[in-house]
Amino acid sequence: MNNVINKEQINSFLNSWAEGVLAIGKCYLENENYTQRALIFIEKHYAFDHGSVMFKPTFTQEKIFRNDKESALSYFAGGEVPEDSGFAIKPWESINLSEVNYLIENNFSAVMGTLHLKPFDNEKISVIAFTFVLEKYNDSIKIKIHHSSEIK
């Protein structure tokens, strides 16, 4: 089985991740079940169902790490953790990637770059640096390690 993840697959995954975050926000704006959409997003993009995941989201202060599916869901859609207002239900109008760097060696794949997030309600762009360590399960790419922080 070939577990190598190439740049094209990583770029496709990054686009899917960004589109997934935007889709959660769209569900929120349209009064649809955004929590269910967030759960589907997490199951598609994160490896929680395959073992341990290390997740340090961008906007956390009290509970820094979200290393289980429930607290990741809280981060994206609000809920379990009191500080969470829901990263994906801000909501964002656009998410653009730049400065993407790849590390692909044998069966190890990592990507880092910047995300430029524009909210619907104002023009202030949030710039976030991110690092994802990726792993392939069958034909699905999932995040094993996610670290992100805001650039001010």
Predicted feature descriptions by range:
Residues 2, 84-122:
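Functional cores of ribonucleases/endoribonucleases
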Residues 28-100:
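A solvent-exposed, acidic/Ser-Thr-rich amphipathic alpha-helical stretch
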Residues 5, 9, 92-94, 142-144:
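A broad structural signal for short, well-ordered beta-strand segments within beta-sheet-rich domains
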Residues 1-48:
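Short, low-complexity N-terminal intrinsically disordered segments enriched in polar/charged residues
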Residues 14, 72-77, 119, 130:
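Aromatic-residue detector
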Residues 104-112, 121-152:
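Short beta-strand edge/turn micro-motifs at domain boundaries
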Residues 21, 115-117, 147:
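Short beta-strand segments enriched in hydrophobic/aromatic residues
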Residues 26-27, 34, 59, 119-121, ...:
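General N-terminal targeting signals
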